[in-house]
Amino acid sequence: MNSDRRYETIKKAGWLVLLLLIAVWPFCAEAAGIRMVSVAGEKVNLRKGPSTQDPIIWELGKGFPLKVIGSKGSWLKVSDFEDDVGWVYKNLVSRKPHLVVKTNKNTRVRVNIRSGPGTKYEIVGKAEYGVVFETLERGTGWVKVKHEKGLTGWIKRSLLWGW
């Protein structure tokens, strides 16, 4: 009987640990140093190194999402949805969530933007590879987004990169 009580105690403790892990899981990526940012300015340079003296790799547009993979002083080492790596000055990015269309790179096929979170909803627009959206709301498998020109709708999450 004594071993039965110990088993029940261990079982309850296991469930408690599992519930705790589920509760803190969304914060683990941030705690591990994995975080996302988006370009705050209209045109921000992605550079080869953490200095204005380093060559420019790309010029990034407003809202472009980036994953932070390191830092040095006032500079962030980032990667984009195509796995390009470079450096941006940290005052030129924000924590406002954005997404970019990541599918159909080598085709002219565009993704559907819908009036609601599902394929049953009306198509209100289309977007091609590389188009950036502000993230408004997250649903199950779908994200409500807004384009800089005002179009708002839902896109299947698996077609996008960012947060």
Residue ranges and their predicted role:
Residues 16-25:
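Bacterial N-terminal signal peptides
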Residues 39-68, 73, 106-141:
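Beta-loop motif signature
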Residues 1-10:
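N-terminal secretory signal peptides that target proteins for export/translocation
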Residues 20-21, 55, 136, 159:
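Residues at secondary-structure transition points
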Residues 32-41, 51, 55-58, 65-72, ...:
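Boundary regions of SH3-family modules and the immediately adjacent low-complexity/disordered segments
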